[in-house]
Swiss-Prot record:
Coiled coil: none annotated. This is 33 kDa chaperonin. CDD domains: Hsp33 (cd00498). HAMAP family: HslO. NCBIfam families: PRK00114.1. Under oxidizing conditions two disulfide bonds are formed involving the reactive cysteines. Under reducing conditions zinc is bound to the reactive cysteines and the protein is inactive. It comes from Acholeplasma laidlawii (strain PG-8A). The gene is hslO. Keywords: Chaperone, Cytoplasm, Disulfide bond, Redox-active center, Zinc. InterPro entries: Heat_shock_Hsp33, Heat_shock_Hsp33_C, Heat_shock_Hsp33_N.
Length: 290
């Protein structure tokens, strides 16, 4: 099944709901970055939330989202536009679980991310706007909920989940974002709060093979009207030419130093780990163009 997001209105158009399945793109990220389970869960939640956020803007803004925590994962970055995402992670080799309590043995994403900030930069026709908020728990969903309330002034509830197998493969990923519209009544808010309180976790919904359609029915108490469906995917978009052009922008001295010291240039894409080699002939062409 392809990854996709549904956008719906519910409760007499008082609530907007986004629901997603993102298993394929999160698994692709895991393979590209070789993440261990807790890093996979953190990155997967971040990718899913970012993909949904990118569908909220109709003018084609490219979003760059960063979670900069003091936990072992370090900084994570996602670029997102119209449901297409790519990501980087500073330390993919993180496998932390709860050692005690009711969550014993489960992935401890909050500790892996730590304290820090969530920032969002919107690139609209090369005009850049950045807003940020402090991380609340490092669990990603809570952090996006707080971001929407403080930076976008949009009361929201964000639920995210990633299920990783014992073999480290991502077997389910998805989530939802609920946005309260300005004219929502107290009755609707109470009803919605009651429904959300009965959901143990998004992971439980995913384990039960609930689709985005099912999630809308549950969250909307069967009042949802689906308006849009968007495919989600992980796509890097890098190419040999793009990195050739980037290298060519180095000054002549820097290029000559690379040529004389290394004889070639090696570039590794941080979003997909693809390696590009530029030979002495390539470097000579770049130098000659100066």
């Amino acid at each position: 099944m392809k990854d996709y997001t549904l956008i719906a209105l519910a409760y007499n158009q008082e609530i907007r709901i986004y629901t997603s399945v993102s298993t394929n793109l999160v698994e692709k990220s895991r393979k590209l970055h070789k993440t261990l389970p807790t890093a996979s869960a953190a990155m997967g939640r971040f990718l899913t939330a970012s993909a949904m956020m990118s569908l909220m803007y109709k003018d084609g803004e490219r979003l760059t989202l960063k979670i900069d925590g003091d936990g072992p994962i370090g900084q994570m970055t996602v670029e997102a536009k119209n449901g297409v995402v790519r990501s980087t992670i500073l330390n993919p080799n993180v496998y932390l679980v709860y050692g005690e309590g009711p969550k014993m043995g489960k992935l401890n994403v909050g500790a892996a991310v730590g304290a820090g900030t969530l920032s969002v930069t919107k690139d609209w026709k090369e005009n850049y706007f950045t807003s940020s908020s402090p991380l609340q728990t490092g669990e990603i969903g809570d952090d996006f909920t707080y971001y929407y309330a403080t930076s976008e002034q949009t009361p929201s509830a964000v639920g995210l989940g990633v299920l990783v197998s014992r073999g480290k493969k991502v077997i389910q990923a998805g989530g939802f974002i609920i946005q309260v519209l300005p004219h929502a009544s107290e009755k609707t808010l109470n009803q919605l709060e009651s429904i959300i309180s009965k959901i143990n976790s998004v992971t439980d919904l995913l384990k039960s093979n609930h689709t985005p359609e099912d999630m809308i029915n549950i969250l909307s108490d069967n009042t949802g009207e689906i308006l849009e469906k968007h495919e989600l995917k992980y796509h890097c978009g890098c190419s040999r030419k793009k990195y050739f052009d980037a290298l060519s922008r180095l000054n002549k001295q820097a290029l000559e130093d690379i040529l004389h010291e290394d004889g070639q240039a090696e570039v590794v894409c941080q979003y997909c780990n693809k390696k590009y080699i530029y030979t002495s002939e390539d470097l000579t062409k770049m130098i000659a163009s100066k």
